[in-house]
Amino acid sequence: MTPFTPSPLSRRQWLKSSGLVAGGAMATGSLTPSLLPALESDAVHVIDGQTTAAGFAAHEQMVAAARRADGPIRLASNENPYGMAPSARKAIEDGWKQHAWYGAPSLPNLKKVYADSVGVPVDHIMIVAGSSELLSIVCLAYGMKGDVLTAWPTYEGLPRYAESLGIRVHKVPLAADLTHDLDTMDRRLTQAVDLTFVCNPNNPTANVTDNAKLRSFVSNASRRSMVLVDEAYHDFVTDPSYSSLVDMVKKGENVIISRTGSKIHGLAGLRTAFVIARPDIIARLQPLSTSAPGVFGALGAAASLQDTAFQAMCKQRNVEGREIMKTAIAKMGRKMTDSQTNFVFFHAGMPVEQVQKAMLAKGFMIGRAFPPYTDWARISIGTPDEMRAVAAALPEIIGGAPKSLGSSER
């Protein structure tokens, strides 16, 4: 197998060499549907809304070439390296004329498709323009009269927004195994706390918190505050002991589940996210929402949700890339978490900024520092070939770095 190496080839050069520029037309910005290769025909690659194995293979080759052409490989923001499903692209192309219309006529269908996919009534679903808005409106609805409780470090969107509003945020350090310290969080759950935030699997640590303990904590917390559970990485989990907390919503508890179209569905640029909650909670959140996904986000998300074959193939490729990284990190004798996401988190033994700089020189962008774990690295999972190249580069960069952990990182 030919080793993977990031290419200095520019996007413009790649478009020319790939024969994607015709009649003097030249692409600018990101690849648009009209410039993507036909991949033979939709009849071959998407059958009954499902991406075929042959279609995924062709799609994978095309996307890998485009990623190399774009410059440094993006392994910093936990994006899906395969982008949107061919079925989603087809849905957007078929609905292209809707781009001139206000609103998104396809939103009601998306709501129904999503409700069916998670097994709740339609009135338990709200669609918003990305997770950032979702977290903001939950904070406005349930965090303004008291404090916010969260583990730390975790996904920063909600805590950061709360602090910008002058809300007091109680940040509970992670446990020794870098999971949520639920015992301490429970002790900090005073009458002053109005909103409790849990990210599971957690970002940046990539791991899941014990299912039984988390359920017990959330059930208790929901009797004292609203609980927001961010399940952005739910679709990547392979740990059989893990389960979503959607069933707690079905039981009528004070729990809001946050999901996104940005990860396994590859729709980060189309800003689509999902709220799962009781109807009365949805009714309180809805007036605070200032926007909704555009027509293309709604069309693409609905098609992708139904394309379970594409999701399964993305998940399998993610497992392959994740195992490549876990093996490489273990061989270097580095401490790491048990990743259940599309990224890994491990002890590099040197400031992350140095690792970033060295990896960028080799053609890879990786994640930033997450205090207090400033010598731990977060690297998103790309294609298996990309991860083999990363695994080969890491020993040269961090091989001689200290393996012992600082007192704040034990």
Residues covered by each model-derived region:
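Conserved PLP-binding catalytic core of the aspartate aminotransferase-like
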Residues: 174-176, 319, 331-362
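Phosphate-binding glycine-rich loop
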Residues: 99, 109-147
